[in-house]
Regions:
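N-terminal leader/targeting and accessory segments in enzymes
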Residues: 2-96, 100
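Phosphate-binding loop of NTP-binding sites
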Residues: 92-212
Length: 212
């Protein structure tokens, strides 16, 4: 049992070291980009995968067009350039990077969810708080398992208050997003009929949104 525990600690330490190293790459870049059509000079391109696309295919292109580093999860791609950084899973790495970055910044986070009205409420809160504080908010409706990490990575040491919109269509999703954002204050706009199938009914909606 002791050997198993020691092995687990070694694995955790190795993973933590990789996240620290990845955060160094992030700090050495001009920001994170996941769309090769929207590259900015010296950015960190993260090659995400989807049902109908594989960002790994655009990693070399991203480097050629000005990305400083590109995060990939296909070994055969990573071998082609020393600035192509291999990880086990690019989405998980994005999320863990955001979680680590959140711990490094001093901003107070407001988490905002609800069946509807989130974006409008977010903008209203920001319009008030920005008069006194340095605030940053979710861009548009980037409020899911990809959008929330990208939002957190936009916050820097000068950010005093961050307003993070969180969307969900099934239970445990808000809980996961809160693990990333670690909000000091949670707000729920309302409980409605949206995503009833995913939540299993209105009671599921209430339970899911209340995870904040």
């Amino acid at each position: 049992t002791r050997k198993i525990i020691e092995l687990r600690h070694l694995i955790d330490a190795f993973f933590f070291m990789k996240i620290i190293q990845l955060h160094d790459y992030f700090k050495d870049s001009t920001g994170v980009v996941t769309d090769s059509r929207k590259l900015i000079q010296d950015c960190l391109f993260i090659a995400l995968r989807g049902e109908n696309f594989d960002g790994n295919q655009f990693a070399e292109f991203a480097i050629e067009k000005g990305a400083k580093y590109a995060l990939v999860d296909r070994p055969e791609i990573a071998r082609k350039n020393e600035r192509l950084i291999l990880v086990e899973d690019t989405l998980q790495s994005l999320q863990e990077l955001a979680k680590y970055h959140r711990k490094k910044i001093k901003a107070k986070i407001i988490g905002l969810t609800g069946s509807n009205g989130k974006t409008t409420t977010k903008e209203l809160i920001n319009s008030v708080l920005s008069k006194k504080f340095n605030t940053k908010t979710t861009l548009g409706n980037f409020n899911n398992h990809i959008g929330v990490p990208l939002t957190l990575l936009e916050f820097d040491e000068d950010t005093e208050i961050g307003i993070v919109e969180m969307g969900a269509n099934h239970q445990k999703e808000i809980d996961f997003l809160c693990q990333l954002a670690q909000p000091e204050l949670g707000l729920i706009t309302n409980f409605g009929q949206a995503h009833l199938q995913g939540f299993g009914g209105i009671e599921g909606v209430i339970t899911g949104k209340s995870e904040i």
